[in-house]
Amino acid sequence: MIQFENVTKRFPGGQEALSELTLSVDKGEMVFVTGHSGAGKSTLLNLIALIERPTSGQVIVDGQNTRRVRRRKIPGYRRQIGMVFQDHKLLYDRPVSENVALPLIIAGVSPRDAGKRVRAALDQVGLLHKEKKNPETLSAGEQQRVGIARAIVTRPKLLIADEPTGNLDPELSLEVMRIFRRFNEVGVTLLIASHDIALIDKLGCRRIELDEGRLQEPQFEDDLVVHFEDDYLPQGDDDGWR
């Protein structure tokens, strides 16, 4: 699903955020990217989302070389990718449902179809009952779940997340990871940047570690897998958003 081939990203002034990085993420994997602040985690995700372009090397996403994606084609390219950020940037003058619908409105989806997909996405994150609420009335964890619903409402093949639990307490962080796990179980590929090693180790997923823009030895904590219960989430129809 994702391939980096000798990728270097150098910013003006000569700073190298990534240096000759080669890695791959298979379709259907849930993988974490870890490393110190400034290690290159966000840059790696930005290259996948075409927020940035590599200085050298190739980034291939679902068989498509990002170097060959022209500027006018970037919005269409990004529709295959759901993006979740630590700062979810919700619109506080609009209800939850309209926040989630925004990518569909931009894509020109009909109001009827958009409404169905918004409700399905909110159901998947356990917030269908709050679709008419203002985001300001929600807790920090609920606001992050609105951001996740917005990311998956376009039914992406790939979901990338940059420190999605950075502002949450341990309990809410685990709740968010449980949601990501459920999406992975229905075939979505996930790549998540996080500094929370203790939480990552509980999940038993492959870990890609960066150090000053370079790849370290791969990590896999198969002896620390935790089997999460999904009781807190409504068991919605997975096909509702896939």
Which residues make up each language-model segment?
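Conserved ABC ATPase signature
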Residues: 134-138, 142-144
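Short coil-to-helix segment of the ABC ATPase nucleotide-binding domain corresponding to the Q-loop/switch region
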Residues: 94-101
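Helix-to-loop junction immediately C-terminal to a conserved catalytic motif
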Residues: 49
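Conserved ABC transporter NBD signature motif
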Residues: 57-65, 77
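Helix N-cap at the start of a conserved alpha-helix in ABC-type nucleotide-binding domains
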Residues: 170-172
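Catalytic Walker B motif of ABC-type/P-loop ATPase nucleotide-binding domains
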Residues: 159-162
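Conserved signature/switch motifs of ABC ATPase nucleotide-binding domains
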Residues: 133-136, 154, 186
